[in-house]
Amino acid sequence: MIYNHIILLIYHIYLNSNLNLTNMKKIILLMSIVFLYSCNNTNTVGEVESSNNNYERNLEVAKEFMKLHEMEDLESQIAMLSDDLIHEPPRYGADLQDKDGFINDIKGYQDNFENMKFTPTYWLPGSDSLGNLNGSVRVYGVWTATHTPTQKSVNLKSYHYWDFDESGLMIQVGDYFDATGMMMSLTSDE
């Protein structure tokens, strides 16, 4: 049906232009090739779905990781990390970190905060740079805690993402929140 509309459109262009019959035949041939090629695209839905097969498993791992952080169970968290982990920390101007840098950050939070609680707003599947679901996990939420040295409360909106390797270990992690602003508020006299 759409092909008929295209032919009618081309015929209308021919009638209202200075194109000769030879040029119109070339245009029709070209449009036919484009149309036939577009009908021959492969179904990529199966490929996209298959790359997202591990999302449910990875979602449970990410949720467990956050619960373990609330419980300050660093050793169990470390067991969930790939040796090749890359971490994108939330601090202003910070470079990417390796596994040891990420573990050091986790330990720093656990040593300096108590009653940590993460309340998720949205758990979402992640995607690659083309928008294809890829099994990664991301979440928006709010951290609440008490800063142990000052006993000041924290209420911090955050975004986190996790990419996983084939065995279900975290291979890339990113944390986005105002870490610098949070620390400055905890050290101010207000």
What does each model-identified segment do?
Residues 65, 76-78, 85, 102, ...:
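Hydrophobic pocket/interface hotspot
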Residues 74-129, 133-135:
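A solvent-exposed, acidic/Ser-Thr-rich amphipathic alpha-helical stretch
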Residues 171-190:
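Low-complexity, intrinsically disordered terminal/linker segments enriched in charged
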Residues 1-53:
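Bacterial Sec-dependent N-terminal signal peptides
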Residues 81, 91, 141-143, 160, ...:
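A mature extracytoplasmic/lumenal domain signature
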